[in-house]
Amino acid sequence: ADKEFQHPYFFQNTYSDQNLYLGHGTLRHVESTALCDYELNRKYCRGIDIDIFVLDGFIENPVLRFFHRTATMIVKKSLRGYVADLNDKMKFDKRLIAWASKGLYRFVSYKKAFAFYEQLFRMVDADKSERVSVLAYRYSSHRRIRKRSSYNEQVWIPFENVVYPAPSDTHDALVCYFGDDYMTPLHLPTAHGRRYLDATRPYQEVVEELKQHPEQFAERIKLLYTD
C-alpha cells in the first residue's frame, strides 16, 4: 500500500516510519497536522489521518485463545516499550518494560519483532474463522468480535455529503463498537484525546512553533473542543 500513494499522502505503519508501533495502518496527509501534546518530540509523521484496520481470525477455543493472546501481548508490550519516551510519565511496570525492551532491541530489530507479531495473527486463517475482529490493534475476547459473514455484503450509507461502504448489518456493528445508545450525540474529545488539528499547515512547522510556544497548544485545544 505504501507504493500506491504519492505526496502529500503517506501510508504509515510500523515498517514505514521511525520509532513507531501501530497495530493497524494509517493514511496521512503530510501537509497537515493532527497531534497530541505527548507527540511533540516524536519523529514519525503526524499529519491528519485515516485509520485502516485488518480483520483477524478469532480463536473460538478459550484455551488456545488464552495462549495466543498471551504470546501476542508479550510481543506487543515489548514493542510499545521500545518506542516509549522514557521522559514521559509512566507507571513503574511500564517503565521497567520500556528499559528492558530498549535493551533487547539493541540486538534484535524491533521491526523484525513486529513481523513476528504479525505472523502470530496470520497463523489464524481469517477466511476460515467463524468470527473476526481487529485483534492486532486491540485483542479482546468480548468486544468488537463479529461474525465473518457480516462482511459478505455491503450497503452504502450517506454521512455528511459522502457515501460510505458498511456491513449489511450496520446497526449490529455500531452496537458492537459503541453500545446500544450510539445515536445519542456527545461532545467529547477524539479517541486519542484532545488533538491539535490544523488542515492548512504541515506538522513539522506546527511542531517547531509549539516547541517555542507550548501555551498555544492549550489555547488551540480550548478553541477546538469548547462549546
Outline where the language-model segments fall:
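Short acidic alpha-helical/loop segments enriched in Asp/Glu that coordinate divalent cations
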Residues: 64
